[in-house]
Amino acid sequence: WETHKILDENISVNPTAVRVPVLVGHAESIYIETEKEIDIELAKNCLNEFSGISVIDDVQEVDFPTSFEHGHGTDDVYVGRIRKGLSKNNSLNLWVVADNVRKGAALNSIQIAENLVGSKM
């Protein structure tokens, strides 16, 4: 329901929340469907270009973001396990980790204020 309030009522979202015993940090498994087929390397490159997003995705080294390593004490959002969905060529799976205290609350408020000041609202 939050996604509909923030973005658009027509976005199809099927969220599931799971609480696990970690001190800080949120992690999400995200499934996305697009209109066209997705090139995984292009998706990784696009994510890497965004300020505040760090891609950690090395299947050979079994390297991906975790709440323990990446979910606290930093402003970045960490994305890994980027792969095509098994059922559709136009789907994508991601694993996302962030410090919910910093990125989820405090930093987002500051970034919104900076954007408002920058746009002279």
Where do the protein language model's features map onto the residues?
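C-terminal substrate-binding/catalytic lobe of Rossmann-fold NAD(P)-dependent oxidoreductases
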Residues: 1-93
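NAD(P)-dependent Rossmann-like dehydrogenase/reductase catalytic/cofactor-binding core
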Residues: 76-121
